[in-house]
């Protein structure tokens, strides 16, 4: 059985962020996935966002989820671009202000969930 590596990169904090990684394996019983979380805490600068995305790349995820408030800001943008440039399929989870970046995310091939 192939174990799928799932990475969660948290840049800043949105209300649903503490629950995201548990949606896939709440009881830690699944043997077909391996989950890692890397967070910047409250910081959302481009430099910190790139740092946490690069830390996630050390895990070599099969795909990643980047959560942040306002995904249109430079920090969250840099995090997802870092993962994309490394060839990691990425889904963005963000809040309403991220709607400003929907077209950009679609054109770049990112999946996204906007929590209102």
Question: What is the meaning of each model-derived region?
Answer:
Residues 1-90:
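Metallocofactor- and cofactor-centric catalytic cores in central/energy metabolism, strongly enriched
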